[in-house]
């Protein structure tokens, strides 16, 4: 399965879940409850899902939120499975350690898609070296910064005006640099994802 590049808004409505983590996809609706499934006429009633269907839906939520294709997600799950500790938190920590995600969490881009663009175009340094691979896993204590030429990009300016900084990173908004201080706690991450279902889904596939 390739990375989903279609409308985030359409996918968010189908999953009844904010992929952008801002709720922006639902700003034209009074609430997420009762949002119609995309299609010719939508659907007023969502069918009850089987256990597998629930696992698949939660996997899709997490997959689209972090902007990964299925192969990338399986690889990260395999990495998380080899780590000591609780697998569900290991999975979140691995996902949160991706470079594109850290650029997003530090408030340098309004979305993860925008963060991937900054990384891919060579605008990001990690510990003083250019990194252009969005999927690179970054170690705790690493310093992530934007090159000076990126400071005036509209994408970056928009993020700095509106994007909150995650509590597990420290950011200097004057130099546009940040440090990955610690792994996030569960209550600092999106609550609308059931990571246990995601783990159950991949346990059958990744040995």
UniProtKB/Swiss-Prot annotation:
Gene3D superfamilies: Ribosomal Protein S4 Delta 41, Chain A, domain 1, RNA-binding S4 domain. GO terms for molecular function: rRNA binding; structural constituent of ribosome. The keyword RNA-binding applies. PROSITE patterns: RIBOSOMAL_S4, S4. It comes from the Bacteria. Part of the 30S ribosomal subunit. Contacts protein S5. The interaction surface between S4 and S5 is involved in control of translational fidelity. One of the primary rRNA binding proteins, it binds directly to 16S rRNA where it nucleates assembly of the body of the 30S subunit. With S5 and S12 plays an important role in translational accuracy. This is Small ribosomal subunit protein uS4. It comes from Mycoplasmoides gallisepticum (strain R(low / passage 15 / clone 2)).
């Amino acid at each position: 399965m390739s990375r989903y590049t279609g409308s985030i808004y359409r996918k968010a409505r189908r999953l009844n879940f904010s992929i952008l983590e801002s709720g922006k996809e639902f700003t034209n609706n009074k609430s997420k409850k009762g949002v119609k499934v995309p299609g010719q006429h939508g659907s007023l009633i969502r069918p009850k899902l089987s256990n597998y269907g629930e696992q698949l839906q939660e996997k899709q939520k997490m997959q689209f939120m972090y902007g990964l294709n299925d192969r990338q997600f399986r690889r990260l799950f395999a990495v998380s499975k080899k780590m000591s500790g609780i697998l569900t938190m290991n999975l979140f920590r691995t996902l949160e350690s991706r470079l594109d995600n850290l650029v997003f969490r530090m408030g340098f881009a309004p979305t993860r898609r925008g963060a991937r663009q900054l990384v891919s175009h060579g605008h990001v340094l990690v510990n003083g070296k250019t990194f252009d691979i969005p999927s690179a896993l970054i170690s705790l204590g690493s310093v992530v910064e934007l090159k000076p030429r990126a400071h005036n990009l509209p994408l970056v300016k928009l993020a700095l005006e509106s994007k909150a900084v995650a509590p597990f990173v420290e950011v200097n908004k004057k130099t546009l640099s940040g440090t990955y201080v610690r792994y996030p706690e569960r209550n600092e991450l999106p609550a609308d994802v059931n990571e246990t279902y995601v783990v159950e889904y991949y346990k059958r596939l990744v040995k």
